[in-house]
Amino acid sequence: MLIFKRWRVFVLGSKLKISVIFVVLALLLSACAQNGSKTASDGYKYNHELNVIDDNYRTYYEVFVYSFCDSNGDGIGDLNGLISKLDYISDMGFNGIWLMPIMPSTTYHKYDVIDYYSIDKQYGTLDDFKRLIEECNKRDIKVIIDLVLNHTSTQSEWFKSAVSALEKGQDSKYIGWYNFQKGKPASDAWYKAGNSEWCYEAKFWEGMPDLNLGNEELRAEIEKIAKFWLDLGVGGFRLDAAKEYYSGNSEKNIEVLKWFTDYCKSVKKDCYLVAEVWDGFSAFSKYYQSGIDSLFNFSFGQATGKITTTLNMAGSTNSAKSYADALCFAQKTFLSYNPNAIDAPFFTNHDTGRAAGYFSYNADKIKLAWGM
């Protein structure tokens, strides 16, 4: 069993309702106000309804399987290695796991998906994944997986079929699943499609051709993919690059999220969906109109986010009070767009710098930051 010394593992912070914070504060204040005249024999009545937190309010541990825990000595982390560390994750207080992409891919990060219905052989098999879900259920750990809907790999059968048809001057349903244009468009994000006269759009990298999420046949296929994983026991999805579904068009992006959220909830009502909309506060907040459960709160994460600047006291406005005010304002804003919104604050993830560097390796600050 090989356990890597440098793990690519990060935390998606716990999500708390404002009411819970107020209840805790009220309890503390009432305790301070006691004058000692009451005794246990006097008794107290509690007539309020139980404040049961929704099952989707959890603390998630992000796992990059590739470098987490290697069970077979091949130098690459795998699902069986992750299973062996579930007690460790649970003991730390996490009741949710977010898996970065686990589907077949040509890259180490696996955000260029080849096949949406299987597991990358470096990580294991579908049977291994089923066992992971089974073991997580025993520990009340909910598993969500990264689902990349913005693009695929150029090695996807969808894309290869589309390019082959264009080269032969034939028709194919897969052509409509991507964004193709004849000739070379002015934008740098377009690349030649094989030996054809067509180019395909790929904003991130030429190995990741963008999908056309307005295509109804593609949407039907995506629904099949979502149902496949939900039926396997997945608790939900982390939606990658949701801001880029239609770059520069938030209305269309919100429509895509609404469609996907509505479908997933129709299959599994309690599934949890969180989207990556890497943008400023006012811009990403509007995406809650889609009805999605959560959006990553980028205004609180990263080296420049509210958590880091507060703990580093970076400026006169970064006090504990200003942090509390910002937290309440954020949650009120999210709830104004979606009354069932769940804030998803995070401190750092695979796209940002390492947390230790934010505080000059001050262990106390790092621990407090995770708690915030």
Feature roles, as predicted:
Residues 185, 262-357, 371:
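Glycan-recognition surfaces
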Residues 32-223, 231, 238, 242-298:
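Acidic/aromatic-lined carbohydrate-recognition and catalytic surfaces
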Residues 15-35:
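Sec-dependent N-terminal signal peptides of Gram-positive bacterial secreted proteins and lipoproteins
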Residues 90, 230-231, 334-339:
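Acidic (Asp/Glu)-rich catalytic clusters
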Residues 86, 369-372:
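Structural preference for long, well-ordered alpha-helical segments in enzyme cores
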Residues 242-246, 355-364, 370:
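Active-site rim elements
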